[in-house]
Design a protein with these regions (language model features):
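The feature marks the mature, well-folded catalytic cores of soluble enzymes
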Residues: 1-163
Length: 163
């Protein structure tokens, strides 16, 4: 697979899409580390596996309609449905994110996709970053990060300055 991205506003040709086949709708709230998930759980609106599967299927249909090639994540035993956090591309390099320890297992979902890419870079363990915190705009790379000393205590701060 040839990859090359310098600007996220360019036409989308390929995309990695997650799935919800192993999604657990009946989850204990203590297993939720993400405040948004907890917010919806406490209001009785935590996502339903089958509704998510339908939404992802419809999303794929729209992408295909516009000629976008879809690469699916491997099915692993997590509540992972989005691929954006797992990595990002700068030019022809795929960077594997160094994500929260509670989510490290999600990286396994990229296994089949990564086999098709030549230039894969795994960041050091102490350089925490998620793909959603990186935005490319031609010659500029924007990275949102949390720089305070209490970083280790923040579960919503997922990118640090070292990244």
């Amino acid at each position: 697979m040839n990859i090359y991205i310098t600007n996220e506003n360019h036409r989308l040709t390929d995309v990695i899409v997650g799935n919800s086949f192993s999604f657990k709708s009946n989850i204990n709230f203590r297993d939720l580390y993400d405040p948004i998930s907890l917010f919806y759980y406490l209001r009785g609106k935590f996502p339903n596996k089958y509704k998510l599967q339908n939404q992802i299927s419809n999303f794929k249909k729209v992408l295909i309609k516009y000629g976008v090639k879809i690469h699916d994540l491997d099915i692993i035993n997590t509540n992972q449905i989005f691929a954006r956090d797992l990595g990002f591309i700068i030019e022809n390099k795929f960077f594997i994110s160094s994500i929260l320890p509670d989510r490290e297992n999600e990286i396994k979902g990229l296994k089949s996709v990564l086999k098709k890419i030549k230039n894969v870079i795994k960041l050091p363990k102490d350089a925490h970053i998620e793909g959603g915190d990186v935005v490319l705009d031609d010659d500029n790379i924007f990275i949102g990060y949390y720089g305070r000393k209490d970083y280790k205590n923040q579960i919503t701060a997922r990118t640090n300055k070292k990244a």
